[in-house]
Structure formats: C-alpha cells, structure tokens
Swiss-Prot record:
Protein known as: Kunitz-type serine protease inhibitor homolog beta-bungarotoxin B1 chain, major component
Organism of provenance: Bungarus multicinctus (Many-banded krait)
Protein family (similarity comment): Belongs to the venom Kunitz-type family.
Lineage, uppermost ranks: Eukaryota, Metazoa, Chordata, Craniata, Vertebrata
Gene3D superfamilies found in the cross-reference section: Pancreatic trypsin inhibitor Kunitz domain
Expression sites (tissue/organ): Expressed by the venom gland.
One GO term describing the cellular component: extracellular space
Limits of the BPTI/Kunitz inhibitor domain: 31-81
Main location, first listed in the record: secreted
Pfam families registered for this protein in UniProt: Kunitz_BPTI
Keywords: Disulfide bond, Ion channel impairing toxin, Neurotoxin, Potassium channel impairing toxin, Presynaptic neurotoxin, Secreted, Signal, Toxin, Voltage-gated potassium channel impairing toxin
Subunit text: Heterodimer; disulfide-linked. The A chains have phospholipase A2 activity and the B chains show homology with the basic protease inhibitors.
Signal sequence region: 1-24
C-alpha cells in the first residue's frame, strides 16, 4: 500500500473514532446478518462482519440483492459494526 493510502486509512480510522463517542455507539442494524453475496453484477471484494469471530472478513459480493452486511472497505465495516464496551 502506498504512503498516501496508509495516510487515508489512518485518517478514516481517526475520523470514525472521533465522530462517534464509544459510549453512544450502536452497531449498524445489518451487522448481525449472515454474509449474502447477492446475485447480479460483477464479483468484487467486500467485507462483512462475522458475529462469531467479532471481526470483519473479506468475501465476494456480486453487487446487488444481498443484505446490508457488506461494506466496501474493512475500515467501514469496522466503523459500522465494532462496538466497544
């Protein structure tokens, strides 16, 4: 990953952490759903929240008709689905 990409990733993580106070965070409503790859469009890499492992994992998403537990980046998945006590 280039230094620009790393800087962008760091910025997104910081923004996510700063905008949403930990005590008031609620998990995205679809994070508890199983991954659904959808059924149309080209396959692309996306991320889903694995409730058993409590982490975001990559999977192949087909672009439509899946549920809401799919995110373009691991960072977005973590921002939406990880809730800290």
């Amino acid at each position: 990953m280039s230094s620009g990409g790393l800087l962008l990733l760091l910025g997104l993580l910081t923004l996510c952490a700063e905008l949403i106070p930990v005590s008031s965070r609620q998990r995205h409503r679809d994070c508890d759903k199983p991954p659904d790859k959808g059924n149309c469009g080209p396959v692309r890499r996306a991320f889903y929240y694995d409730t058993r492992l409590k982490t975001c994992k990559a999977f192949q998403y087909r672009g439509c008709n899946g549920n809401g537990n799919h995110f373009k980046t691991e960072t977005l998945c973590r921002c939406e689905c990880l809730v800290y006590p």
